[in-house]
Regions:
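Membrane-interface "cap" regions at the ends of multi-pass membrane proteins
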Residues: 10-67, 259-262
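Membrane-helix boundary/coupling elements in multi-pass transport proteins
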Residues: 65-71, 107, 134-147, 237-257, ...
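Extracellular/periplasmic helix-exit of transmembrane alpha-helices
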Residues: 205-215, 268-305, 375-379
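Hydrophobic, membrane-embedded alpha-helices of multi-pass small-molecule transporters
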Residues: 49-65, 202-210, 218-281, 321-330
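Hydrophobic alpha-helical segments and their helix-loop junctions in multi-pass secondary transporters
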Residues: 139-165, 174-175, 194-221, 406-414, ...
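Membrane-interface loop-to-helix entry segments
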Residues: 5, 9-27, 130, 146-150, ...
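Helix-loop-helix module between adjacent transmembrane segments
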Residues: 11, 15, 91-107, 111-176, ...
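Extracellular loop-to-transmembrane helix junctions
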Residues: 2-19, 73-103, 112, 315-316, ...
Length: 476
């Protein structure tokens, strides 16, 4: 329990200390007008209250990640605590903050456009296709799951098909309508419910004072299947430490902020909050595994068991609400992000409903196609979905390298993103080699390949960096 309390305090302290330092490195301009004010269109560029933006950003980036990912990551032992804390402070929150602030500086541009500015046109084109496919995949996946749960809670005539239609109609409305009409109204409520559930679990942890692993016991790998901590744990716990998906969501809120000074509490703060939620659930899962063994691999069952046992009936209701609402609120903003990404590279203004429909109809059609495929061939789709975890972290690699280039050109401390970029390069390159859904190579060979990929990236950066001294860049 001592280790848990210490790392929890370190996480909070990281927001005030390292978060403040990262903010100074970027240098927010409190006088500069934001896109929400200069480009207001009543649809995507709408000034919103800061507290509401924080809640929306938190729910956008959270979803089920800090709960399910942390629970599965807890099987690796105390190392999961360290990754959540250090990953959040030095990688995830930095990644979210700087990508969000760059979006503000570049008129609310979506992630592929930002990456393209700093990594070149070929990378921009790759990221345009990559992120749109990723967003549509997320949107499709997070329809059937919640629909199945809702079908179990409602009368027989409200079957899975009925709820799939209801959820998808909601997705269509949330993707098309102005951000303040649906997302701005219901997201804060769902975010409060998710936070309330986490706070309740934290109170019970402190009250019951269960035996939790301490760092003094060592960082032994306790995973029942013997999966290696590196790189598997660093991909399993994504949203609770660093996730590329977050950078696709930050531009949504970058278009609603009224002042750059709110960037740290919104972008860095939302990520730290998510890290706290992940840490709480990792500790709770540790208690569950200690009492029931590690055979259970269904995170939904673990969440249901913990909340009902610790929080009673209300906790059970919150668990159901969270497990249903979290994926839905990830799916709708994923499709909204897809619309904005396409609008950016096609240079289509989105004030007109006709222009929005022009983009959304193909997106909805592809999403429905993927959804139907997932229902007909669950095994085949499951294999596709397994790659999401790797693709998600690969996206964070591109984002970190792009931000590193920005910091170099702006003559700022680029080490704050260079080291995370190198580390995540090692994680992703090793994971795709070692994972069963990847090349399924031996640990030894995978580590060598991962190390070589990281070395090549480092050498490439040093070579590029040496050419930068003679180049003068504009200040953004």
């Amino acid at each position: 329990m001592i280790t848990f309390i210490i790392v929890l305090l370190v996480l909070v302290g990281g927001y005030f200390l390292y978060g403040s330092y990262v903010e100074r490195v970027f240098g927010p301009d409190k006088i500069r007008k934001t896109p929400a004010l200069t480009m207001a269109d009543g649809v995507d560029f709408i000034p919103l209250p800061t507290w509401k933006i924080f809640m929306i950003q938190f729910l956008n980036i959270a979803g089920l990640g800090p709960i399910f990912g942390a629970i599965m990551g807890a099987k690796f032992g105390t190392a999961s605590y360290l990754w959540i804390v250090l990953g959040t402070i030095f990688a995830g929150a930095v990644h979210d903050y700087l990508s969000g602030m760059l979006s503000i500086r570049h008129d609310g541009e979506s992630l592929p456009e930002i990456i393209g500015r700093y990594l070149g046109l070929p990378t921009k084109q790759l990221m345009r296709g990559f992120t749109v496919v990723l967003m549509i995949l997320v949107g499709a996946v997070f329809v059937a799951g919640p629909a199945g749960l809702l079908a179990k809670l409602t009368p027989e005539y409200m079957d899975v098909t009925f709820w799939i239609i209801v959820v998808f109609v909601y997705y269509m409305l949330a993707t098309l309508l102005p951000v303040d009409k649906i997302i701005g109204k219901i997201y804060p409520l769902f975010a409060i419910a998710l936070l309330f559930m986490a706070v309740g679990i934290l109170v019970m942890l402190l009250w019951n004072h269960p035996a939790l692993p301490e760092i003094t016991d060592g960082l032994h790998n306790t995973h029942p299947a013997g999966l290696p901590i590196f790189p598997i744990m660093f991909v399993s716990i994504a949203c609770g430490a660093i996730s590329g998906f977050h950078a696709t969501q930050s531009p949504l809120m970058a278009r609603c902020m009224k002042n750059e000074k709110y960037g740290r509490p919104i972008f860095y703060g939302a990520m730290v909050t998510e890290g706290i939620v992940a840490l709480i659930w990792a500790a709770a899962a540790t208690c569950f595994f200690h009492q029931n063994g590690m055979e259970e691999s269904n995170a939904s069952i673990i969440v249901d068991s913990i909340t009902k046992e610790w929080l009673g009936t209300i906790g059970g209701l919150l668990a159901v609400l969270g497990v249903i609402a979290a994926p839905i609120t990830s799916g709708d903003t994923a499709l909204r992000s897809a619309r904005l990404i396409v609008a950016d590279f096609m240079h289509l203004e989105q004030k007109s409903i006709a222009k929005r429909l022009l983009i959304c109809i193909p997106i909805f059609a592809v999403t429905i196609g993927i959804l139907l495929y997932s229902q007909r061939d669950a095994a085949g789709f499951d294999m596709i979905w397994r790659y999401f975890a790797w693709c998600n972290q690969a996206l964070s690699v591109f984002t970190l390298w792009a931000v590193t280039v920005f910091l170099v050109r702006a003559k700022k401390n680029y080490y704050i993103t260079l080291f995370p970029a190198l580390f995540m390069t090692a994680v992703c390159s090793t994971y795709i080699c070692i994972a069963p859904e990847g090349l399924a190579l031996s640990d030894y060979v995978s580590y060598i390949i991962g190390g070589l990929c990281t070395l090549v990236a480092a050498i490439g950066f040093v070579s590029w960096y040496r050419k930068q001294n003679s180049i003068v860049y504009e200040k953004i």
